[in-house]
């Protein structure tokens, strides 16, 4: 009897850059390739072809993408480029004429076809190689859930609509089906992402679909309520975290879901600035006073709600008075987590044509001031948590010290992965593992992180 020797499966390497939405794109591409029989390589040497999923939002991000392409070309030589910078194929090919293919953002089929051309699959589809929740590039216990693509806004500093197009919402039943599979596969935390989560379903007129015998609208509030009713294998509700939430009036409706425990008390809202004149030049909504009133009302309903936001300093025309207005607004708003960015011109953005550019040294000085302001606010808010007992999801468990003690790193409900703070735990049990959710007594705090012990 002879044994048929099957040809080895071609292997694909992946370099994923940019935002969580791009990471989801990478996961979908790899899931399809795995189903087509491809193996995954953790390094350049073992890959038959390397995919580089690029970011093209800022010039600095473009340069990082070009450097990543250059490294992949030097280390492997067989490279396919995809992602947001794929829109600038001429720039990529001018610098790297030997790349095998260049495709744009979320062009999954074109990427897969390019891989097939570069390293043909040796066998037919192997759907059984794909986990129930698809391939993931995040730890098993948390997953990004992308609900739409593109954006209908025309912010002066942004080129996302040019890179990713207008808003295209996924069907509500498709989103819920994916979420259900992720939770069944071990996900304990769902991070809902898009370019504009609040606008979910607008483009499809909130098209209702049947889900487990009920009609559910494609609307952020309806989606949040349904996600909050999912259950893990232990019978617990997963943490559900909303990102990129524009403060439209209907956002008020999700706050009671937080009070009911259906939604993690956390909102990521891209305010960008507070000065009405700067917001007008940015082509952003200028209702900062109303926002302060709403923040107070949200906190009255869900006292533990954490608000994260990001701000741009040094936007063209920003005066010292504008910047001081922002600092005063932040003092009153008392946001929990804040990211700040120095304005950077982006090729194709409307802001490039605005007069009165802010000098780089002024941008830097304002950046340092806003970071100092928000760090002080964060330190005070975290100090107020000392003595409380909070639920914490474990991200990593360390090795035992010489005395046998083990430490761990986790996050509270106020902390999203990668962008917010941590909770550092001492003297944890050897049985503790990533993905466990435990009650932690907070013993100490600094301006970013909490420190505690499992109760």
Swiss-Prot record:
UniProt catalytic activity: L-aspartate(89)-[ribosomal protein uS12]-hydrogen + (sulfur carrier)-SH + AH2 + 2 S-adenosyl-L-methionine = 3-methylsulfanyl-L-aspartate(89)-[ribosomal protein uS12]-hydrogen + (sulfur carrier)-H + 5'-deoxyadenosine + L-methionine + A + S-adenosyl-L-homocysteine + 2 H(+)
Domain of life the protein comes from: Bacteria
Residue ranges occupied by any TRAM domain in the UniProt entry: 383-455
CDD domains: Radical_SAM
A UniProt-annotated Pfam family: TRAM_2
Compartment list: Cytoplasm
Residue ranges of every copy of the Radical SAM core domain listed in the record: 137-380
Co-factor requirement: [4Fe-4S] cluster
UniProt-listed Enzyme Commission number(s): 2.8.4.4
Sequence intervals crossing the membrane: none
Every MTTase N-terminal domain range: 10-120
GO cellular component: cytosol
Keywords of this entry: 4Fe-4S, Cytoplasm, Iron, Iron-sulfur, Metal-binding, S-adenosyl-L-methionine, Transferase
Binding of [4Fe-4S] cluster 2, residues: 151, 155, 158
Biological processes, Gene Ontology terms: tRNA modification
Coiled-coil segments: none
Cofactor binding summary note: Binds 2 [4Fe-4S] clusters. One cluster is coordinated with 3 cysteines and an exchangeable S-adenosyl-L-methionine.
Main subcellular location: cytoplasm
Task performed by this protein: Catalyzes the methylthiolation of an aspartic acid residue of ribosomal protein uS12.
Name of the protein in question: Ribosomal protein uS12 methylthiotransferase RimO
Organism: Sphingopyxis alaskensis (strain DSM 13593 / LMG 18877 / RB2256)
Recorded name of the encoding gene: rimO
